[in-house]
UniProtKB/Swiss-Prot annotation:
PANTHER family: LANOSTEROL SYNTHASE, TERPENE CYCLASE/MUTASE FAMILY MEMBER
Gene it is expressed from: shc
CDD domains documented for this protein: SQCY_1 (cd02892)
PFTB repeat residue numbers: 67-108, 413-454, 530-577
Pathway(s) it belongs to: Secondary metabolite biosynthesis; hopanoid biosynthesis
Record's protein name: Probable squalene--hopene cyclase
Stretch forming the signal peptide: none
NCBIfam families per UniProt: hopene_cyclase, squalene_cyclas
Length: 647
């Protein structure tokens, strides 16, 4: 008898099977005709606000219906505090509030309307729009609201620096790189938004807008580095206007070449909104009209991010079909049965040709001898494949071909494995898109007030890569990569037993990821780091049997897990983590399973309004609409499968 069996909450097997069947049927209903899944990916109010402001920047014809729907979305997401949060029911955020107010005013909302008065008072009570972050300030500078003295100098000549330079573009993350290159062109040309309505937001400032200076030091920044870089910024501000014209022209040409090589068709450069928007504004500033092919392509890419409903609309930051499809395939394979397995195989068949095999992207600058073999997060993003997605896809393919007794995906698996092994950073961990992106001093640049300029190794991505390598046959005894990955995870565990989650919120996500990796790598379930993690997960279970965690757990003055209302996805992660640690019979697992069963709606799925994923900690969060559909199903099916072999 298991040590926990006498203290177990009863789970009715028939009811559990009904829950699994209902969730499976509902999940399959979201499948596209070609076999893949793509769910909505919602951020905060900033992206839809920026979309409105982009249209008016370019003086595009006003789409009254679309603007009305985006306006409805913005008004609904306004917080009780008067401003806009970064997450559902979250605290006031200055930059989100300034952009949302600006967009609503641009749409035509009266400044005397109750919601606008409330927003304006909330912004002014917190020091006014001068306290916006650096990217918001760039937008305001482009609109002429603040002067260019309010933003850091971004000399376009940076693109010509040699690779050994401490400020080379390949020393920052892909998302920063693809955003900054067109932004540098804008910073040099200093264009002015067309803004045919002449809308401004001077009323959000407590001082003359033209007197707004540079941002103060951000909390994550070191005084020494900050003062050094602020001094360099001051010097550049003096000399930048006097740099040789020919050098500037060559730098702009280099930036354009960089952009056009990575334009990525109608999926957009980097396949993320900020890059696409900056590219469109860059071409406009260079005098290219809206029929100029690269500009037109980039502009169409942006509209593919829109989600337009009956009453509301918003703009997504990017699309997530590879991630959604791969994780759905995992859930369906866990469910089992002929239909679910067949649909998972069709999803994997959709994924297979999307592997990047012939493009050496930006990652190859630091790993020139590695063959490509990764998958991107989006439909197409060949220059920027994602290690997390690649690991998840390879694991799903490996499981499928083992079940089928075939070698159908063997070549794809081998190339994915080879690429991931070659992308291991020197500290033993893996990052999301780059290798050895460890120049932490760059987060002290005036531009980096967000603290997200880099893509260093993280516990969650490292765990996924270790899981994949172990699943395909690499173990600590004979694999240097896995041994170093395990060592990285061992030393990054927090004292209370958790691991940080960079791309999911937060310590629940990181701990689930690592426990799965340790299990796959054959680490003894009695290992102290596993026992500490189990004890921690059990200790934070909510009264209702679920698990929930708040985004404020990312605060710099870390003091531990921050409880929030239970969510289906975070509960599923906790359950999958505990089961990976051999705790399927633990009473906490049964309580968590009961929570998921009780929270399941009549349509077979789970309602989850809270944000449980992370774009940039403390700056930008995500709500994957698919998370509440496939993760709970995965956990319930895993519980059923383990219990059926453990009674």
């Amino acid at each position: 008898m298991n040590k926990h069996s006498g203290n177990r909450t009863a789970i009715d097997p028939a009811a559990l099977e009904m829950s699994i069947a209902s969730a499976t049927e509902a999940l399959l209903a979201y499948r596209h005709a070609d076999g893949h899944w793509a769910f909505e990916l919602e951020a905060d109010s900033t992206i839809p606000s920026e979309y409105i402001l982009l249209r008016h920047y370019l003086a595009e014809p006003i789409d009254v219906v679309l603007e009305a729907k985006i306006g409805n979305y913005l008004r609904r997401t306004q917080g009780a505090h008067g401003g806009w949060p970064l997450v559902h029911d979250g605290p006031f955020d200055m930059s989100a509030s300034v952009k949302s107010y600006f967009a609503l005013k641009m749409i035509g909302d009266s400044v005397d309307a109750a919601h606008m008065v409330k927003a304006r008072e909330a912004i002014r009570a917190r020091g006014g729009a001068a306290n916006s972050n650096v990217l918001t300030r760039f937008l305001l500078a482009l609109y002429g609201v603040v002067s260019w003295r309010a933003v850091p100098v971004l000399p376009i000549e940076i693109v010509l620096l040699p690779i050994w330079s401490p400020f080379h573009l390949y020393k920052i993350s892909y998302w920063a790189r693809t955003t900054i290159v067109p932004l540098m062109v804008l910073a040099v040309l200093k264009p002015r938004a067309k803004n045919p309505k002449g809308v401004g937001i001077e009323e959000l400032f407590l001082q003359d807008t033209k007197s707004v200076g540079m941002n103060p030091k951000a909390p994550h920044q070191s005084w020494g580095w900050f003062l050094l870089f602020r001094g360099i910024d001051g010097i550049l501000r003096v000399i930048e206007p006097h740099l040789p014209k020919k050098l500037r022209e060559r730098a702009i040409a280099s930036a354009l070449a960089f952009t056009e090589e990575r334009l990525n068709g109608e999926d957009g450069m980097g396949a993320i909104y900020p890059s696409m928007a900056n590219i469109v504004m860059m071409y406009d500033a260079l005098g290219k009209d809206d029929h100029f092919p690269p500009r037109a392509i980039a502009r169409r890419a942006i509209d593919k991010l829109l989600v337009i409903g009956e009453e509301e609309a918003y703009c997504q930051p990017c699309l997530s079909p590879v991630w959604d499809t791969a994780l759905t395939c995992h859930a369906l394979q866990e469910v089992g049965g002929a239909n679910a397995v067949a649909k998972a195989k069709q999803g994997l068949d959709w994924l297979k040709p999307r592997q990047v095999l012939d493009v050496k992207g930006d990652w190859a600058v630091k790993a020139p001898n590695i063959r490509p073999g990764g998958w991107p997060f989006q439909y197409n993003n060949a220059h920027y494949p994602d290690l997390d997605d690649t690991a998840v896809v390879v694991m799903a393919m490996d499981r499928a071909q083992r079940h089928a007794g075939s070698k159908e995906y063997a070549t794809a698996i081998a190339r994915g494995r080879e690429w991931i092994e070659g992308m291991q950073s020197r500290d033993g961990g893996w990052a999301a898109f780059d290798v050895n992106n460890l120049e932490y001093y760059l987060n002290n640049l005036p531009f980096a007030d967000h603290g997200a300029l880099l893509d260093p190794p993280t516990e969650d991505v490292t765990a996924r890569c270790v899981s994949m390598l172990a699943q395909v046959g690499e173990f600590t005894q004979r694999s240097k990569a896995v041994a170093e990955g395990i060592a990285y995870l061992r030393r990054t565990q927090h004292a209370e037993g958790s691991w940080y989650g960079r791309w999911g919120l937060n310590y629940i996500y990181g701990t689930w990821s690592v426990l799965c990796a340790l299990n796959a790598a054959g680490i003894d379930h009695q290992d102290p780091m596993i026992r500490k993690a189990v004890e921690w997960l059990v200790s934070i279970q909510s009264w209702d049997g679920g698990w929930g965690e708040d985004a404020i757990s990312y605060r710099l003055d870390y003091s531990g897990y921050e409880q929030a209302p239970s969510t289906s996805s975070q509960t599923a992660w906790a359950l999958l983590g505990l089961m990976a640690a051999g705790e399927v019979e633990h009473p906490a697992v049964a309580r968590g399973v009961n929570y998921l069963k009780n929270a399941q709606t009549e349509n077979g799925l789970w309602d989850e309004q809270r944000y449980t994923a992370t774009g940039f900690p403390r700056v930008f969060y995500l709500r994957y609409h698919g998370y509440s559909k496939f993760f709970p199903l995965w956990a319930l099916a895993r519980y059923r499968n383990l219990r059926s072999t453990n009674v």
